[in-house]
Design a protein with these regions (language model features):
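Short, solvent-exposed loop/turn segments that connect beta-strands within catalytic domains
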Residues: 144-148, 162-166, 220-225
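Conserved catalytic cores of phosphodiester-cleaving nucleases, focusing on short active-site segments
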Residues: 80, 153-161, 166-191, 211
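Short, mixed charged/polar active-site loops
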Residues: 148-152, 165-167, 255-257
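A structural signal for short, well-ordered beta-strand segments and their strand-loop junctions
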Residues: 133, 168-171, 230-235
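Short histidine-centered catalytic/ligand-binding loop motif
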Residues: 68, 101-104, 189-202
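Short, solvent-exposed loop/turn segments at secondary-structure junctions
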Residues: 139, 175-177, 238-239
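Nuclease catalytic cores
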Residues: 1-141, 148
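Metal-dependent nuclease catalytic regions and adjoining charged, substrate-binding loops involved
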Residues: 197-205, 209-309
Length: 309
């Protein structure tokens, strides 16, 4: 099926046109998270009640969070490597991966792998679905009002159902969980997306919809309709739990969780969100340049003062 795709070399991309990444888009539409302020609150909480923060300073709490993030990034890279071996059907590479990463003694990695294998077996079970490609870099050109820019991204995996003539975009996650339900304290997203809650499910949906828009615009066979492109967010958790709401079924023992998009695909809405993020990115770049210029001028002034003596 990969031969049916077009423009995979991305030679059509005009390097003179600016771009913003889809990760940056999600960053700009999400309320700022002040880690230091939250860590200080955790420190104060630890002083008043006996909890996991008791005896820790806010700097130690920040260090713990950074260590946890680094570990998650490491496992994310390992999972990417395993999925590549599995999707490419290279049994020797799979065996080598298992040995090199000592998977037999790593319960977390075993859980990630089990979740992926279960999902892969489930989606391929009918015999109608074919693996198309992975780590596909896509460029989505947006022209709205007086702005012309790209939203750049890299989709995790693409499948094709030959019976239904449907393309399936997959975005892998390896979170402990994906937040789908908020409460009265849950903040909203920003800009044109402020009608949506600040939850993983919604920002991940923004991500896969960008891939969908890009594929329809530049990569899938011409004439492909939006209804023939399905998006799925699949969580491959680090610990086992029984899946109760998987899209592909509710079989006991399944530990992956598959989510359909949180809201309907609306190209006009998406482009407004992307334009907002592009403007924010442009503004931040201008502010950084101005700050760098001011710092440079300050250094020159200090040097001139020094030269006087």
């Amino acid at each position: 099926m990969i031969e049916k795709l077009r423009n995979l070399d991305n030679k059509f991309v005009d390097k003179n046109i600016p771009y913003v990444t889809i990760s940056a888009v999600n960053g700009y539409i999400s309320p700022k998270f002040d880690q230091e302020a939250i860590a200080k609150k955790c420190e104060e909480k630890g002083k008043t009640i006996n909890c996991k923060w008791t005896g820790l300073t806010y700097k130690e709490i920040l260090d713990l969070w950074e260590q946890k993030a680094n570990v998650s990034r490491t496992y994310g890279k390992k999972l990417d490597a395993y999925t590549e071996c599995k999707l490419e059907g290279d049994e020797n590479s799979i065996e080598e991966f298992m040995l090199d990463n000592d998977v037999d003694t790593d319960e977390r990695m075993k859980a990630h792998i089990k979740a992926f294998d279960q999902f892969y077996e489930r989606i391929m079970k009918s015999g109608d679905v074919e693996f198309v490609g992975r780590e596909i870099e896509v460029w989505n050109r947006i022209t709205i009002n007086d702005n012309d820019f790209y939203v750049k991204g890299r989709l995790d995996a693409l499948f094709y159902n030959k019976r239904t003539d449907t393309w399936i975009i997959i975005d892998w996650k390896s979170n402990e969980c994906i937040s789908t339900k908020g409460n009265k304290w849950t903040p909203t997203l920003l800009g044109p997306a402020q009608s949506l809650p600040n939850l993983d499910w919604y920002t991940y949906t923004m991500q896969v919809f960008n891939y969908k828009e890009a594929l329809l615009q530049n990569y899938l066979p011409e004439g492909t309709e939006a209804s023939h492109v399905q998006c799925m967010i699949v969580n491959l958790p680090k610990a086992e739990y029984e899946n109760t709401d998987a899209i592909l079924g509710k079989n006991k023992g399944e530990i992956y969780k598959a989510y359909m998009p949180a809201f309907k695909y609306d190209e006009n809405f998406l482009n407004r969100v992307f334009e907002f993020a592009y403007k924010k990115d442009k503004l931040e770049r201008s502010m950084r340049k101005l700050k760098e210029k001011e710092e440079s001028e300050t250094k020159v002034e200090k040097q001139e003062e020094f030269d006087l003596f």
